[in-house]
Amino acid sequence: MNYKISVIVATYNSGDFLNEFLDSIKSQSLGFEDIEVIFVDDASTDSCTLDLLHDFNKKYSNVSAVFLDENSGFPGTGRNRGLDLAGGEYVIFADHDDSYVENAFEVMYDKINENDMLISNFNQVFDDKVVKFK
């Protein structure tokens, strides 16, 4: 399958966030079927993360999970492994606690196709208050 976007997520003991993260990807107006999600787990020790990743891998053909044997302690290790596997036209590095508005990927995809480079911004949410990044 040729995906428009590959989303690479390095995880470690992040089970509490994974459903919400994947829900925000599934709701993308670009179309979930055009998005590849690659989770690379950095040897999590909690069963919640491992169970969810195995479930996602079975349930969705465009979601894969890779499990590292040893904890590297560095998200770049998982991201680099994900890059080796990514088949999308473009790549997004995401964190397990990220959440995206419904048109985020569509806007980014359209903009990158209109320009040579795309640099995006983000907002941080703490205690239900949005803190804009400057």
Model-derived features: where do they sit?
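Nucleotide-sugar donor-binding/catalytic module of glycosyltransferases
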Residues: 1-134
